[in-house]
Amino acid sequence: MANVVVVGAQWGDEGKGKIVDWLSERADVIARFQGGHNAGHTLVIGNQVFKLSLLPSGIVRKGKMAVIGNGVVLDPWSLFAEIDKLSAQGVEISPANLMIAENTPLILPLHQDLDKLREEAAGASKIGTTGRGIGPAYEDKVGRRTIRVADLGDEETLDSRLDRLLAHHDALRQGLGAAPIDRAELRAKLLEIAPKLLQYAQPVWKVMNDYRKAGKRILFEGAQGSLLDIDFGTYPYVTSSTTMSGMAASGTGLGPSAIGFVLGIVKAYTTRVGEGPFPTELDDADGQRLGERGHEFGTVTGRKRRCGWFDAVLVRQTCAISGVDGIALTKLDVLDGFQTLKICTGYEVDGQHYDHLPTAASLQAKAKPVYEEMEGWQESTQGARSWADLPANAIKYVRRIEELIQCPVALLSTSPERDDTILVTDPFAD
């Protein structure tokens, strides 16, 4: 059986949580490999709704091992709050079903402070971060001054790390008009949580390789979306990690050959949270309708999402970069009742045609979508579980998307319920 990597192929919020949950029933191990608690998943299982932002989606299923890899930045206090919330909903979480890489960097309160201070100082030029310290935590990782999970096990090491970290942050805070960090208070907080966090710590790279050798089925769960990738996203309006499929290997300690099937999650229209270019954005009644019908509010921030028509150019681009083998098309039911649907097939920039999104921010800002119109459908697709349940025009819409993005549909989702899914290609099959 192939291991499967799940990545968002747009700006996030594509419905990865449901798809990962649907796939996790057949996986043995579900691993997060990048990001932090800045992206949320909403899972609907029976009559229960679970909202996750850091824990892998598979944590809600019994008999699965949930893994937080070294590519993640971990806020321990948010982790414990999420564990407590799920425990109150009847989910059992212990070292028997949750493992955290020893070399995972920690998000500390000072990272969140810096995130907010910078956004306030930027004013109208702000990036639109969630303010949860993700970016500053990754900066410290690359700057070789981060505190990692394993550092909590030795006070001498922790003190050395704190000295280096605070020398940097106090200088930044002074420039932003903020008071120095209370070292004693931060140290006490870290020592307080150390035993609780260290119980989950493991050499994830070794355990994952052992799982692979034993033939365990591994599901790699990406966060955010490919268009928020630090290298290939709409820079600088991006996240601070690599969101493409290749990160599944380096973010857990498995080699690239461990990746079998890459599944890109794609919404049947387009949404975005925060600032940045969005060529197909709709500021009219159609955009309002998409937002209302799709319940487009962020799981983590509660912010209203910007909505627009499906952008085949962007999805083709991200599928190529991540090596997507098949997509899971979600929220098709949101398009029920539209008389006419539009798909972006290219851009016009200063009279020149583009079949991809240009890298230069100045060109991205001027990109005008070139649309292809398709006839909509009035019948309901909600809850469809086979092609026979879909209106003819809905099938035409799906097939046209496949042609334009040059990638087949492997799964089709027609409601938040996990079983309302049409399987075309089994991602776990060799």
UniProtKB/Swiss-Prot annotation:
InterPro entries: Adenylosuccin_syn_GTP-bd, Adenylosuccin_syn_Lys_AS, Adenylosuccinate_synth_dom1, Adenylosuccinate_synth_dom2, Adenylosuccinate_synth_dom3, Adenylosuccinate_synthetase, P-loop_NTPase
Keyword Amino-acid biosynthesis applies: no
Binding site for Mg(2+): D13, G40
Keywords in alphabetical order: Cytoplasm, GTP-binding, Ligase, Magnesium, Metal-binding, Nucleotide-binding, Purine biosynthesis
GO cellular component: cytoplasm
Assembly and oligomerization: Homodimer.
Homology family: Belongs to the adenylosuccinate synthetase family.
Protein's name in the database: Adenylosuccinate synthetase
Taxonomic lineage from the root: Bacteria, Pseudomonadati, Pseudomonadota, Alphaproteobacteria, Rhodobacterales
Encoding gene (name): purA
